[in-house]
């Protein structure tokens, strides 16, 4: 069983049952261990306690990691990130090295004092626990190295795009983006790739379709942030956090992205990167497939506007979106189309065109 924030595994039940049984046996035979040259009973109590604390810290880290999703505000994510740094520092710099050293010490004590154990069964139990300890420590090391190599591979792919990488940056990324978020992002990217394979209009648009889509993109409201919204604190395309003064473009589904990011995205895929809703649900690309682009700039503009008027059903912008962002943003451009949309009307480029202008 594995739940985000709990992460209770099957071996936790095995460990707890083994711990309870061993503690009872050691407590019953406590005085008999004094005949041994080395205090094996103290060793096993300390080892059990340390492993138990180690697992508790893992539970705490998993709980902190569950609060690092994009659905949470930047302040909460920063607090969870700092908490993970502290917890993981205790695990990796204190408890994990101590368990290695303590296990080696226990092995040496056991080889020199195994004949003094009260019962034969305890000798085998002690040996099994040592083997379990070594296997667990090695598994933790291999799992961590594997996760680090996986993240490093992702950063190497980014380096091909000119983004600088560092080993420290990979470590910070592993803490800031927990495993569940990393896997969810991978699934989302695979879903986007599948969508792109079946619907990737940017590669197949005719010039007339391209002009119409570009005109629709430019009609989307554009703002400059004067405050960062808690529920949408970063651009999902470039994964950079929003800051005051950033220029963003708002979609009808009330999701914000950097202007340059979303413009490039919509030229290839007219679905919202976050919720997968169609940004232009009334756009009929098939109706534009036979239109030809004119050779002059003036004729291209008239042709694009006419195409929009003919093949897009006029609908008012979603008022809920503007109400939501009104306190956070102010417009970069206050052209007539945007002002009309903010007032609940229809942009004139979509309504005032007559057939005579074609």
Swiss-Prot record:
One of its GO terms (cellular component) is membrane. A zinc finger (RING-type) spans 235-276. One of its GO terms (molecular function) is zinc ion binding. It is a multi-pass membrane protein. Pathway: Protein modification; protein ubiquitination. GO terms for biological process: protein ubiquitination; sugar mediated signaling pathway. It is found in: Membrane. Residues 336-358 are annotated as: Disordered. It is an enzyme of class 2 (transferase). E3 ubiquitin protein ligase that acts as a positive regulator of sugar signaling during early seedling development. Possesses E3 ligase activity in vitro. This is E3 ubiquitin-protein ligase SIS3. It comes from Arabidopsis thaliana (Mouse-ear cress). The gene is SIS3.
